Amino acid sequence: MRLAHALLPLLLQACWVATQDIQGSKAIAFQDCPVDLFFVLDTSESVALRLKPYGALVDKVKSFTKRFIDNLRDRYYRCDRNLVWNAGALHYSDEVEIIRGLTRMPSGRDELKASVDAVKYFGKGTYTDCAIKKGLEELLIGGSHLKENKYLIVVTDGHPLEGYKEPCGGLEDAVNEAKHLGIKVFSVAITPDHLEPRLSIIATDHTYRRNFTAADWGHSRDAEEVISQTIDTIVDMIKNNVEQVCCSFECQAARGPPGPRGDPGYEGERGKPGLPGEKGEAGDPGRPGDLGPVGYQGMKGEKGSRGEKGSRGPKGYKGEKGKRGIDGVDGMKGETGYPGLPGCKGSPGFDGIQGPPGPKGDAGAFGMKGEKGEAGADGEAGRPGNSGSPGDEGDPGEPGPPGEKGEAGDEGNAGPDGAPGERGGPGERGPRGTPGVRGPRGDPGEAGPQGDQGREGPVGIPGDSGEAGPIGPKGYRGDEGPPGPEGLRGAPGPVGPPGDPGLMGERGEDGPPGNGTEGFPGFPGYPGNRGPPGLNGTKGYPGLKGDEGEVGDPGEDNNDISPRGVKGAKGYRGPEGPQGPPGHVGPPGPDECEILDIIMKMCSCCECTCGPIDILFVLDSSESIGLQNFEIAKDFIIKVIDRLSKDELVKFEPGQSHAGVVQYSHNQMQEHVDMRSPNVRNAQDFKEAVKKLQWMAGGTFTGEALQYTRDRLLPPTQNNRIALVITDGRSDTQRDTTPLSVLCGADIQVVSVGIKDVFGFVAGSDQLNVISCQGLSQGRPGISLVKENYAELLDDGFLKNITAQICIDKKCPDYTCPITFSSPADITILLDSSASVGSHNFETTKVFAKRLAERFLSAGRADPSQDVRVAVVQYSGQGQQQPGRAALQFLQNYTVLASSVDSMDFINDATDVNDALSYVTRFYREASSGATKKRVLLFSDGNSQGATAEAIEKAVQEAQRAGIEIFVVVVGPQVNEPHIRVLVTGKTAEYDVAFGERHLFRVPNYQALLRGVLYQTVSRKVALG
């Protein structure tokens, strides 16, 4: 019992001590007021690649974060509360990576700083909205239970401002979610060239922005002070805000034992909406609701994205005819152009449609009277004509002499007697009918009046002599001739053919019935009385022009001013004159080399063609380019394609030229548009596809993009290939190990265009030079261009320079009149060095000879093993040829030959062409083989001392027998023409004009030797032979 009383005080003391320990521990826990701070660090392309070496600006951001972590120190408030820190961090680009979750400070300070220091930048796009929402998630799942003590520090440059859809709902949505949760967001800039509007959106309000800066380019004291001030200001703001939360009461003693349960309190205020829960399963469909009231008209929505191309609309109606435009001012008369070249003879055309008959021609001259034609075949007898009315009785004429007894007519059959008819009245005279079929012989009628003689018809064109026809029947009796003198009564002739039927006379009275046979016809009666004059005939044809009369005396002046008479009718065409004598032989027409020279002067610039080509555009689509600059770059590509199509006539179609575009960002972020794609049918489809390219806004892996271009868009081809690489020259070479010279090769030319980015940085020339293959051993060197801004891409001058560079290897026709030798050839140029030439003119011929020699020695050969050799010799009098025979040789080295020509001195003596030809003939027989073509080009005016045409003919024929073909150059008008013809043809008797045109060259003066393309003409004809 005593033991129990002794132990009881000890037990009570132990219980009291335990109670004090528990209360003490609770008091300590209550004194901590935790604050959660989470860093959101931007390591996108616009930050990582802004400074060299790449990642330097990210290192500054990491340095800022570590300095900030070092400043997170606990603080004791007067309310007996301690501020303690929980800190964490993430970094982001187009993906988000947690550096370290919320960690208790200061115990986890070193681990957090080490994790920040080990960050490797992403260097791609910028998804700030996703990063903020990930930071909110980290703050909510750990740390303090007080939402008022949770803070987010977003360190970014704010890029990009626009141009692509942020995948996590957008920046404003993320910031509004933070405000809704009561989490404050500080916005800290990476300066300069940050986007203040975006940073202002990120900050909870303007007090959380305050021009805070986390990194600056400069290393000055001011920059360090600004960063230190940023850290101190943010920490002080958090401490002040937290004090109001942690010290919401003055003092609080240790807690006592729990009291009795209190009464239920009043209903509290409505709490803040909770976080959105997970998406539930779809419920059963509800029944249709009642029709609601008509809603108010909503506000105008934001502008939608560009719609797809609509279907082709219906064909429009034909428009009204436009008004006639105002006539333009007449232009000035242009300069006289070069004469056009004769075109090739066209193929015969199809027979045209027969044209309408032409107008009646002028009457031809009267032809000579043709010979009497042979008798034609008997015509069919015409139908009997109507009887004309008898004319008025004429005056009795003088009795004519008795006519010759007519031939007895055929005996006719006796006709039946007709009944006497009544006498009819005289009818109108009808037109003469065609002769009818001969009828039976009628009763003898009364003699009709004699008709007027008709007018003579025009003489017809004599016809071709026809074949002899069959003997025709006996013709009718001819017209009655004029009465001749009375002749002797002749014996009765044979019975003649019946005469033409006369006009039907009036019916006579019935006679007594006959009773005998019909007698022979009586003699013709006397001519009747002369009838009245006939109607006037039509106007006859004009007669032949008479001989020119003598000039008459001048008439008296007529002072009356009469009106001018009507212009007379066009006269008849005179007879064709005799053929004139043949004209002189005209000068030779332009040679082929002269024609090519004319063509080159007229249209060589417009005939050079650009293409076919393969042009590739490699377009930087990284974040540092910016949306507006990316759109300008696409317009530049379209304008280049248009200029090549219109100005350079490049045809972008299958089998011709090809174009392609590659846009790129970071690794595996490439997209291309290719004219070889099945959905791109023409250049218009290609341009539409380029317009639809969307800005990627990521990192910059230029080497990988160039490798992609070579693998996908550079198949083997014979076309000229050129690649235009448009970039800011800041490829992430630390992570992109593909060399920038991947396109360098002998089959492609690379042009790099470097442009300042959105931060105003000048493009890196070192990368641009490597891209364009400059200073490299492999590949053809390209061109590197640097521009201040993307707007300069659309400058007209720059576009013109780019298209000129693309088409620098134009395919132009060859107007140089090239020459080719089909066999080995030895050519000697024989220069006249006599006194008649003169020293100045001799120097001119030496220059001309060197031009010819250069053309000969550089000419093409059908077989490279066949040699062309040239020798130049000057001559004057007898025995005066230089170089001498010992030094003379054929040369193939132009430099040596030109030096020997330059060393020639003017001889200035007599002229002996025969001796010069004999010298060259001996030289060829000794130094030239038999299979080699031997040609001599001789300068001469045909004058030779003491030489005759026969002597020259002998010398030329001797050279021809040695196989030498002679060409002659004649300078000036003072020439011996007969001797020149003998030098050309080797004949004194005749001259072949065609042969002379090929072997004779006439020049007006020595200066003309060096003008134009005469040296090409001469060398070509000598080469062809």
Curated annotation (Swiss-Prot):
- What are the alphabetically sorted keywords of the record? Cell adhesion, Collagen, Extracellular matrix, Glycoprotein, Hydroxylation, Repeat, Secreted, Signal
- Source species taxonomy: Eukaryota, Metazoa, Chordata, Craniata, Vertebrata
Protein name (database record): Collagen alpha-1(VI) chain
Quick one: where's region N-terminal globular domain? Answer: 20-255
Q: Where is this region: Disordered?
A: 252-588
**Stored PANTHER family:** COLLAGEN ALPHA-6(VI) CHAIN, VWFA DOMAIN-CONTAINING PROTEIN
This protein's species is Mus musculus
Q: Which Pfam families match?
A: Collagen, VWA
Covalent S-S links between cysteines: none
Chain segments carrying region C-terminal globular domain: 592-1025
Domain (VWFA) spans: 36-234, 614-802, 826-1018
Q: How does it assemble?
A: Trimers composed of three different chains: alpha-1(VI), alpha-2(VI), and alpha-3(VI) or alpha-4(VI) or alpha-5(VI) or alpha-6(VI).
PTM summary: Prolines at the third position of the tripeptide repeating unit (G-X-Y) are hydroxylated in some or all of the chains.
Q: Name one GO molecular function term.
A: platelet-derived growth factor binding
Q: Name one GO biological process term.
A: bone mineralization
What subcellular locations does the record give?
A: Secreted, Extracellular space, Extracellular matrix
Q: Which residues bear sugar attachments?
A: 211, 515, 536, 801, 893
What does the similarity note say?
Answer: Belongs to the type VI collagen family.
- Composition bias of kind Pro residues appears in 578-588
> Where mainly located?
secreted
* Compositional bias per record (Basic and acidic residues), positions renumbered to this chain: 267-284, 300-333
